[in-house]
Regions:
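Conserved, structured core segments of small domains
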Residues: 1-109
C-alpha cells in the first residue's frame, strides 16, 4: 500500500489558542481512527511553538487520506491555513516508537 504525508500549516501567529480549544476532540478522533497512521506529530517553529502537523498514512489512495483529513477536528475547525497530501516513499526509518497517551486515561489537575 502506498504511503502519504499530510502536511498542515497553521494560521500564524495565534494558532495555539485554536489548537488548544480543539485538542481533546482532535486526539479523540485520532485515537479512534489511527489504524492507517504510521507516524504523526506537530511541526514547531524556531521558538518551539507548534505551527503545523505532519501525519504519515498507509492508505490505498490520496482520496482516502483526504477523506480522513476532512473529518479531522483541526481541519474542520480551521486550524490550518494551508494543507497538502503528497505520496511518499520511505527510504530509511530510524524512528523510536513513542506511545501517545490516551486522553481518556489522563486526569486533569
Amino acid at each position: 500500500m502506498p504511503l502519504f504525508l499530510f502536511i498542515g500549516h497553521d494560521h500564524p501567529p495565534n494558532s495555539m489558542a485554536l489548537r488548544d480549544a480543539v485538542r481533546a476532540e482532535h486526539r479523540e478522533y485520532v485515537l479512534q481512527h489511527d489504524d492507517a497512521i504510521r507516524s504523526a506529530g506537530a511541526m514547531v517553529d524556531a521558538h518551539g511553538h507548534q505551527c503545523g502537523t505532519v501525519i504519515a498514512f498507509d492508505m490505498a489512495s490520496v482520496d482516502e487520506v483526504w477523506a480522513w483529513v476532512r473529518r479531522e477536528p483541526f481541519f474542520r475547525h480551521g486550524v490550518y491555513a494551508r494543507t497538502e497530501v503528497v505520496e511518499w516513499t520511505l527510504a530509511l526509518n530510524r524512528f523510536e516508537l513513542r506511545d501517545w497517551p490516551d486522553p481518556r486515561t489522563l486526569t486533569q489537575g
